[in-house]
From Swiss-Prot:
GO MF terms held by the record: rRNA (cytosine-N4-)-methyltransferase activity
Alphabetical keyword list: Cytoplasm, Methyltransferase, rRNA processing, S-adenosyl-L-methionine, Transferase
Function: Specifically methylates the N4 position of cytidine in position 1402 (C1402) of 16S rRNA.
Residues at which S-adenosyl-L-methionine binds: G33, G34, H35, D53, F79, D100, Q107
Catalyzed reaction equations: cytidine(1402) in 16S rRNA + S-adenosyl-L-methionine = N(4)-methylcytidine(1402) in 16S rRNA + S-adenosyl-L-homocysteine + H(+)
A Pfam entry, by short name: Methyltransf_5
Broad class of where this protein is predominantly found: cytoplasm
Annotated compartments: Cytoplasm
Family to which the UniProt record says this protein belongs: Belongs to the methyltransferase superfamily. RsmH family.
InterPro entries assigned: RsmH, SAM-dep_MeTrfase_MraW_recog, SAM-dependent_MTases_sf
The protein's name: Ribosomal RNA small subunit methyltransferase H
Keyword Methyltransferase (UniProt): yes
Gene assigned in the entry: rsmH
Enzyme Commission no: 2.1.1.199
Length: 309
């Protein structure tokens, strides 16, 4: 299948980077290269773009899309490792970094990847198919209490306890091998009247995907490391697609903007923790009505931006 992905909040994200034509920029989630191409259009031959993705299909697609540009470095890795990636490339500081945390349209539409609850496929959900842990491992090997906590914390699923119990009961008969089997278990666990609120499997699939790819653990460290690698006035722009991610970005930005831990009664700061960033977006930027109509997957997107000081 051709790698297709419509970049969300494209114009807003590029504008937020305040691109310098001879600057160095990092696209932490290269995908099909949509954001990267717009960055490259604004760079001179002295500028440079580093494109990172853990999905080899994404890198292959991006190389084709960006074949007319010579100032691109492709890295097959997880942006969790941005610090060591830049170290290996002998790059000290950069002028801008973007992260688009959404699952690509290709990954959702390619049934064999197991991300979609709309298509029957093997339970996989790995962004990086070289990793060992898959959705199959989570569903068939995790204890009931572990499953419950994942569904509750990562999926904010109100029926997490019941779904976890149904999964464990079903797998005692035979291993649960496909997304279709998992969807049926979820349907049986959630009362019919609550299944009118969108697809019943949406929250569970989100939770399992986050667990498989360690998405939330990765995000906190990646934000800190990214800010440390920015030049003065460099920008970090992050697009999230669900409340858990957005909350992490919001809280981490606030911590980096106002890190002082001194009691309010202290007349001056004595903790020595100085602000690292200035938050550009006091409220997140959301897609326009037109973009939401054109690309339904953009509806939950939020863009938050900060500037290194």
């Amino acid at each position: 299948m051709e790698f297709k992905h419509i970049s969300v909040l494209l114009e807003e994200t590029i504008d937020s980077l305040n691109i310098k034509e001879d600057g160095v920029y990092v696209d932490c989630t290269l995908g099909g290269g949509g954001h990267s191409k717009e960055i490259l259009k604004k760079l001179s031959h002295k500028g440079k773009l580093i494109g990172i993705d853990q999905d080899t299909s994404a890198i292959k697609a991006a190389k084709e899309r960006l074949k007319d540009y010579e100032n691109v470095i492709y890295v097959h890795n997880n942006f969790y490792n941005i610090d060591s990636i830049l170290e290996e490339l002998d790059i000290d500081k950069v002028d801008g970094i973007i992260m688009d945390l959404g699952v690509s349209s290709y990954q959702l539409d390619e049934a064999s990847r197991g991300f979609s609850y709309m298509k029957d496929a093997p339970l996989d959900m790995r962004m990086n198919r070289e990793e060992n842990l898959s959705a199959y491992g989570v569903i068939n090997n995790y204890e009931e209490e572990e499953l419950f906590k994942i569904l509750k914390n990562y999926g904010e699923e109100k029926f997490s306890r019941k779904i976890a119990r149904f999964i464990v009961e079903k797998r005692t008969e035979n291993p649960i091998e496909t997304t279709g089997e998992l969807v049926e278990i979820i349907r049986k666990a959630i009362p019919a009247k609550f299944q009118r609120e969108g697809h019943p499997a949406k929250r569970t699939f989100q939770a399992i995907r986050i667990e498989v790819n360690k998405e939330l653990q990765i995000l906190n460290k990646a934000i800190e490391d990214s800010v440390n690698r920015l030049n003065k006035d460099g920008r970090l722009s992050i697009i999230t697609f669900h409340s858990l991610e957005d909350r992490i970005v919001k809280v981490k930005f606030k911590e980096l903007e106002k890190p002082c831990t001194c009691p309010p009664s202290f007349p001056i700061c004595v903790c020595g923790k100085e602000p690292q960033i200035k938050i550009i977006t006091k409220k997140p930027i959301e897609p326009s009505k037109e973009e939401k109509e054109i690309n339904s997957r953009s509806r939950s997107a939020k863009l938050r931006v900060c500037r290194k000081i």
